[in-house]
A protein has these predicted regions:
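Bacterial Sec-dependent N-terminal signal peptides
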Residues: 1-22
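Basic side chains
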Residues: 2-3, 24, 31, 124
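N-terminal cationic amphipathic segment used for targeting or macromolecule association
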Residues: 12-15, 25, 56, 84
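N-terminal active-site segment of His-dependent metallophosphoesterases
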Residues: 17-40
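Structured beta-strand-rich core segments of catalytic domains in phosphoester-bond hydrolases
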Residues: 22, 37-38, 62-128
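Active-site beta-strand/loop signature of hydrolases that rely on acidic residues for catalysis
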Residues: 23-30, 45-69, 104
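Extracytoplasmic/secreted proteins, especially bacterial periplasmic and envelope-associated proteins
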Residues: 40, 44-51, 73, 77
Length: 128
């Protein structure tokens, strides 16, 4: 796990080395795109991200093409509203689609890899 985190950190540093001295990272559990009011609102999620101005956003609890999200590619919806590049890593099949994690980046990464993580409970994914 430490090697994986080191690799991810190195990737993020490479992104920032192009033109900046700092890198703004954000992690966001979007709870299947449903807010505290149980309303699915992609623009509201994008507004939060746009307000922070991150170079990289790691998203958790992300639906893709599920019935509960209106069979939409949620990460693509958010990416379009934030002008960021989207990378999805499915962890499980769910509700007619996939459920997993995502990464949004301002710059196109040199290389990305997804993998499933071992465990006894619900399957997990990792983007490196």
């Amino acid at each position: 796990m430490k090697k994986t985190l080191l690799l991810l950190f190195t990737l993020l540093l490479a992104l920032s080395a192009q033109s900046q001295n700092s890198l703004r990272l954000m992690t966001y559990n979007i709870k299947n795109a449903n807010g505290m009011d149980d309303v699915c609102d992609f623009q509201r999620i994008a507004d939060v991200i746009n307000h922070i101005h991150p170079e990289v956003v790691a998203l958790q609890e992300l639906d893709s093409m599920t019935h509960r999200s209106g069979q939409k590619y949620v990460l693509g919806e958010i990416a379009g509203r934030t002008q960021m590049h989207a990378y999805f890593a499915p962890a499980i099949d769910y509700d007619g689609g996939k459920y997993g994690i995502g990464l949004l980046t301002k710059e196109i990464p040199v290389s990305l890899k997804t993998m499933t993580l071992p465990g006894r409970e619900e399957a997990r994914a990792l983007i490196m």
